[in-house]
Regions:
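Conserved S/T- and glycine-rich ATP-binding loop of Class I adenylate-forming
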Residues: 57, 74, 105, 166, ...
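Conserved AMP-binding A3 loop
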Residues: 31-33, 167-195, 199
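Structural core segment of the AMP-binding/adenylate-forming
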Residues: 48-49, 76-150
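Conserved AMP-binding/adenylate-forming core of the ANL superfamily
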Residues: 2, 21-64, 68-72, 89-94, ...
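Flexible, low-complexity linker/hinge segments
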Residues: 1-4, 136-166
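Conserved pre-ATP/AMP-binding loop-to-beta segment of ANL
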Residues: 19, 152-171, 177-178, 183, ...
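A short helix-loop-beta submotif of the ANL/AMP-binding
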Residues: 56, 62-82, 86-90, 98-104, ...
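Conserved AMP-binding/adenylation subdomain of ANL enzymes
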Residues: 193-221, 228-265
């Protein structure tokens, strides 16, 4: 079964509405074309480190454009995004990544010290992707995110292709025990998406129909909670799938004033 998959959905949006906003954080705005192209750069890096179909790619990030870009990169080359709670300490991370066994991890510079500790306990990780947040330089064992996100020359697709059976792995927070990964088929996630725009996602994929339905930029949503939570990630995917945009706060702790200012904008 082919089924719907997010990479082709988002590529369809980027082709139809290339200049529509896709992400915004503070003064940073990313168009649908740039969102797609930057994800291609990350996807190319993933292929370069030797990933195979349905390898896991962990997002150890605060909210920001890089989170959704890296998720899209995973989908493009048939990998499984893995949400990672940025509040975890080294032991909790070692457990989570020991369970998920990611082939690659993308992380904010703020977490360098913690990652340094965990690296020795996660030898299966082939590549570490560093997102500069002004807190520390990129370590020699990692690759700078900006250096790969801006280098794509074409759309990325792995030899094994894409289909709706490929997964998204959502881990619980572990509040009632150890974190557990919930395996979602992409086609099932699409079927459960709330309708946030003009197109109705039918049982059988119809990417041409999606393109015809998109005539203008869609609605905007504000991901006020962390993208590492299913609420924010799944809502964001639903909005982006209809040509909409996702805004995130610049602060790393909840700021009601910034949130309301963003709502007004």
């Amino acid at each position: 079964m082919a089924g719907w998959e997010f990479a082709t959905i988002f590529e369809t949006v980027a082709d139809r509405l290339p200049d529509a906003p896709a992400q915004r954080q503070g003064v940073r705005t990313t168009s649908a074309r740039a969102f797609d192209r930057r994800a291609d750069g990350v996807a190319a890096w993933l292929l370069s480190i030797g990933v195979v179909e349905q390898d896991r790619f962990a997002q150890y990030l605060y909210n920001g454009p890089e989170y959704l870009e890296s998720v899209l990169a995973a989908y493009k080359v048939g990998l499984v995004p893995v949400n990672t709670n940025y509040r975890y300490g080294a032991d909790e991370l070692a457990y989570l990544w020991g369970n998920a066994e990611p082939a690659a991890v993308v992380f904010h510079g703020s977490f360098v010290e913690t990652v340094e500790v965990v690296r020795a306990r996660t030898p299966w990780v082939r590549g570490w992707l560093f997102v500069d947040d002004g807190t520390s330089p990129c370590p020699e064992w990692a690759t700078d995110y900006a250096s790969v996100a801006t280098t794509a020359t074409h759309r990325q697709r792995a030899p094994w292709g894409r289909d709706g059976d490929q997964l998204c792995l959502l881990y619980t927070g572990g509040t009632t025990g150890l974190p557990k990964g919930v395996m979602w088929r992409q086609d099932d996630l699409v079927a459960l998406m709330p309708k946030t725009g003009p197109f109705t996602f039918t049982a059988e994929p119809d990417y041409d129909g999606l393109a015809r339905a998109l005539s203008a930029a869609g609605q905007a949503t504000l991901a006020a909670c962390p993208l590492m939570h299913g609420t924010a990630l799944l809502t964001s995917q639903a909005v982006l799938a209809q040509g909409g945009s996702v805004a995130t706060l610049t602060t790393r702790r909840f700021d009601a004033v910034e949130l309301l200012d963003d709502v007004v904008e």
